[in-house]
Amino acid sequence: MVNEFDKLKAGKLLLASANMLESSFKRTVLVVCEHNERGSLAFILNRPMEFKVCEAVSGFEEVEERLHMGGPVEVDTVHFLHSRGDLIDGSLEILPGIFWGGDKNELSYLLNTGVMMPSEIRFFLGYAGWSAGQLEAEFEEGAWYTAEASKDIIFSDAYERMWGRTVRSKGGEYQIVANSPELPGLN
């Protein structure tokens, strides 16, 4: 496996390697929203929580979609990805057609009036963050891979299969990695 840190940028996927056993990131798929000389910020895509947005986020009482654990940093903050940057001021495009953040009051209004559908948004509690040099060191240790992101992956509900499918899509030796058991020592 090669160190793919140089390929990392906003809009890419970050895939936990099969060697990543730390529970917060084991077999996770994250979308990178910010990556620069100060560090990196991403959201875990395949860690849905048991409760719904309407149960945890004020102003979004009509949103029956599940809330997602974005990462272990600042878990008392709410973040969102969406596909309607044309309607929400302050949105940052992280890849074509996918936006991070923006005005939460506008978002609430657009959802409550039916202009936007809940399927166009993914809500997260917290985020995954790395300071300068930290993520690069983890890549050097073989903890992460990268992959191309897409709207289909970001808004997918196939949580259980997301990591395996995404790693497998890289081809070659990654197909073997994707099929490896979670705890090979128990075989």
Curated annotation (Swiss-Prot):
Coiled coil ranges: none
Source species, domain of life: Bacteria
Signal sequence coordinates: none
Entries under Pfam families matching the protein: DUF179
InterPro entries in UniProt: AlgH-like (IPR003774)
Gene Ontology cellular-component terms listed: cytosol
Protein family according to the UniProt entry: Belongs to the UPF0301 (AlgH) family.
Name the record gives this protein: UPF0301 protein Ppha_2142
